[in-house]
Curated annotation (Swiss-Prot):
PANTHER family cross-referenced by the UniProt entry: LARGE RIBOSOMAL SUBUNIT PROTEIN UL2M (PTHR13691:SF5), RIBOSOMAL PROTEIN L2 (PTHR13691)
Keyword vocabulary terms for this entry: Chloroplast, Plastid, Ribonucleoprotein, Ribosomal protein
Subunit structure: Part of the 50S ribosomal subunit.
Compartments where located: Plastid, Chloroplast
Keyword Chloroplast attached: yes
Protein name per Swiss-Prot or TrEMBL: Large ribosomal subunit protein uL2cz/uL2cy
Short name of any one Pfam family annotated for the protein: Ribosomal_L2_C
Gene Ontology BP term (one): translation
Primary location class: plastid
Disordered: annotated segments: 1-23, 224-274
SUPFAM superfamilies: Nucleic acid-binding proteins, Translation proteins SH3-like domain
Gene Ontology terms for molecular function: rRNA binding; structural constituent of ribosome; transferase activity
Length: 274
C-alpha cells in the first residue's frame, strides 16, 4: 500500500508517514478477545521482556496458516488491517461456503481467486507442497513441520526462495539470509507477503508508539548501579567492563545466544547474515 504524508500543521504530522487507510471490519466468527495481563512479566511479576505495556485493546483475527481447504477455489473479498501483525490480511470466500483469513500476498486485489492443493497452478496466493514447485519460486508462509501450518516468512514484505530439491528435502533461502533444509512435503504459499513499504513508515510522535504497546527504552549507562551493570559513575562514564552486558550480567551486543547442539543445527547449511 502507498505511504501517506500529512500536511505539516503540527510536529507529529510533519514527521509522520503512515499507510494509506485500510479499513478493518472483521467477521465476528473469525475474531476473539485477548487477555494481556503480564505486560512483559513472568508468573512472579518480574520483567522478562522489557519495554512492553499499555497499548490499545486488540481483537485477534484467526489466520489460516495451514491452508487445508484442498482443491476448493476461493475469492478475495476484502483486504483488511490487522493490529496483531504488520502484514495485511485477506478475507477469502470459498465455494463450499467456508470463510477464512489469510496473509495478503503482494499484488493480490479484491476479486482474485486462490486455491491450495497438490496439483494447482504456480500462481500468487496459491498454496502447494514444495515438491510441486519449480526451482527459483518466491514463497512465503512456509511450514517447518508437515501439517502444522506456515511458520516462516510471514512478516510484511517477507519472501523466501526455493533454490534446490534433493532426496526428501528442499533447500530454501530465508529472508534472514539463512539457507536451510525443509521436507519437500511441507507446504508454502507462492509469492511475497504484502505491505512491502512498512519499513518506510514513521510514527511521528511518542504517543503512536505507546498505542502499539511499546514503552520507552532507557540505556543502561544512564541508570544507577543498582539497576544495571553499566550504571553509575560521575557524569558521562564508560561502562567499566571488558564487554557490554545485559541487566542480569550476561554478555550482550554480538555474543551468540543460540543454544548449542540444537536439533536443527544439521538442517542449517548457512548461518543467517547479521
Amino acid at each position: 500500500m502507498a505511504i501517506h504524508l500529512y500536511k505539516t500543521s503540527t510536529p507529529s504530522t510533519r514527521n509522520g508517514a503512515v499507510d494509506s487507510k485500510v479499513k478493518s471490519n472483521p467477521r465476528n466468527n473469525l475474531i476473539y478477545g485477548q487477555h494481556h495481563c503480564g505486560k512483559g512479566r513472568n508468573a512472579r511479576g518480574i520483567i522478562t521482556a522489557g519495554h512492553r505495556g499499555g497499548g490499545h485493546k486488540r481483537l485477534y483475527r484467526k489466520i489460516d496458516f495451514r491452508r487445508n481447504e484442498k482443491d476448493i477455489y476461493g475469492r478475495i473479498v476484502t483486504i483488511e488491517y490487522d493490529p496483531n501483525r504488520n502484514a495485511y490480511i485477506c478475507l477469502i470466500h470459498y465455494r463450499d461456503g467456508e470463510k477464512r483469513y489469510i496473509l495478503h500476498p503482494r499484488g493480490a486485489i479484491i476479486g482474485d481467486t486462490i486455491v491450495s492443493g497438490t496439483e494447482v497452478p504456480i500462481k500468487m496466493g496459491n498454496a502447494l507442497p514444495l515438491t510441486d514447485m519449480p526451482l527459483g519460486t518466491a514463497i512465503h508462509n512456509i511450514e517447518i513441520t508437515l501439517g502444522k501450518g506456515g511458520q516462516l516468512a510471514r512478516a510484511a514484505g517477507a519472501v523466501a526462495k526455493l533454490i534446490a530439491k534433493e532426496g526428501k528435502s528442499a533447500t530454501l533461502k530465508l529472508p534472514s539470509g539463512e539457507v536451510r533444509l525443509i521436507s519437500k512435503n511441507c507446504s508454502a504459499t507462492v509469492g511475497q507477503v504484502g505491505n512491502v513499504g512498512v519499513n518506510q513508515k514513521s510514527l511521528g510522535r511518542a504517543g503512536s508508539k505507546r498505542w502499539l504497546g511499546k514503552r520507552p527504552v532507557v540505556r543502561g549507562v544512564v541508570m544507577n548501579p543498582v539497576d544495571h551493570p553499566h550504571g553509575g559513575g560521575e557524569g558521562r562514564a564508560p561502562i567499566g567492563r571488558k564487554q557490554p552486558t545485559t541487566p542480569w550480567g550476561y554478555p550482550a551486543l554480538g555474543k551468540r545466544s543460540r543454544k548449542r547442539n540444537k536439533y536443527s543445527d544439521n538442517l542449517i547449511l548457512r548461518r543467517r547474515s547479521k
